[in-house]
Amino acid sequence: MKLWGGRFRESESELMEEFNASLSFDKKLYEEDIEGSIAHVKMLNKCKIINNEECEEILSGLKSLYKDIRSGKLKIEGDYEDIHSFVEVNLIDRIGAVGKKLHTARSRNDQVAVDMKMYVKKSSYIIIECINKLMETIKDKAENNHFIMPGYTHMQRAQVVTFTHHMMAYYSMFNRDKKRIDNAISNLNESPLGCCALAGTTYDTDREMTSKELGFSKPVDNFLDGVSDRDYIIEVLSAFSICMMHLSRLSEELIIWSTKEFSFIQMDDKFSTGSSIMPQKKNPDAAELIRGKTGRVYGDLIAMLTIMKGIPLAYNKDMQEDKEQFFDSFDTLKMCILVMDGMIATMTVKKEAMKEAVKGGFLNATDVADYLVNKGVAFRDAHKISGELVIYCENNDKAIEELNINEFKNFCNLFDEDVYEFINYNNVIKKGNKKIM
């Protein structure tokens, strides 16, 4: 069932119908399509393009369609080209010929553009809510596990940090992700409804009214731009991809920390799986799947950039491919955030394992150098002395803090008994701007 065909002598081939149809996936837009149609009908009535009785009949029909779809009474299926065809044809079946007036002063080009903008905006707000929940979980886990642990550069133990500070780094990352998505919402918040196919309409319509009715800040400035660009989807997918990158980095650390080699955390059974052959295995599959699905969201972004890169103005059918990319990214990101939230909330942080890792990594070597700087030694010389001290400790299987004062003085006679307090790991994180950790 199509909304066109008058100028054609022959019907599409079955192959072309199957190739061209999008109902199987754009049915997700039924709420937005009906909501946009309701706003459009109200505007047609206000502008005296349809009368009050016609307006009420169409509105009643649209609302009954929405109710029946929501309840499952009406299934979105059948021989329809897209969700727009499904809604309009079913409306006409219900209310008769007056339903044919719904599409006055509107094209599917501005119709699908407004549907997608509304869906992207709604979905983006859902992602922001999910990020907020994850951030609170991270903060709670961080604040309730204020333990020292190794901080790493190049995956080598570097300096002592706290588990709190380490986790709050991800809190900051996700906070920026949230801001990026919110900014993308601001950029897309202009209504394309009323642009029609590409050049507006000869009817004296009220785009300000439909824009306000649908929750947009204003109508788009340019008809061609309104129906032909999907940069707002690309911008949101870019923000989604960056968020997935942060989820993937966190997943990688959780995977490493959960190994016996590290044993910094223990994953809860609720977010772990086992092996079909090795009974002892407890695998961090949830984190691994998040890490893997990051590539999937990246792929959706690259697909959208590629779809749009060579399209002339205005609308082209290529743009039908925007929907599956966005739907997939939204569903994937939402699920990954929810799973990460569950993993963080239920995992156990192992204080003693982190503490032992700190002791074995010479993580106070920089503090030894700082101690000597406070005694008047130039930092570069202090750095050299501290490095030589580390070699001595490695050769003698000792931690720096285990050296006696005479061993310290063999490297520099400025060392005194106060060095032990200065390089104590629990004291180190309380000095200077480290206090924020």
Swiss-Prot record:
Principal EC category: lyase
Subcellular compartments: Cytoplasm
Catalytic activity: 2-(N(omega)-L-arginino)succinate = fumarate + L-arginine
GO terms (BP aspect): arginine biosynthetic process via ornithine; L-arginine biosynthetic process
UniProt keyword terms in alphabetical order: Amino-acid biosynthesis, Arginine biosynthesis, Cytoplasm, Lyase
EC number(s) stated in the UniProt entry for this protein: 4.3.2.1
Example of a GO cellular component annotation carried by this entry: cytosol
Pathway linked to the protein: Amino-acid biosynthesis; L-arginine biosynthesis; L-arginine from L-ornithine and carbamoyl phosphate: step 3/3
Lineage top rank: taxon: Bacteria
One Gene Ontology MF term: argininosuccinate lyase activity
Family listed: Belongs to the lyase 1 family. Argininosuccinate lyase subfamily.
Name assigned to this protein: Argininosuccinate lyase
UniProt source species: Clostridium acetobutylicum (strain ATCC 824 / DSM 792 / JCM 1419 / IAM 19013 / LMG 5710 / NBRC 13948 / NRRL B-527 / VKM B-1787 / 2291 / W)
Gene giving rise to this polypeptide: argH
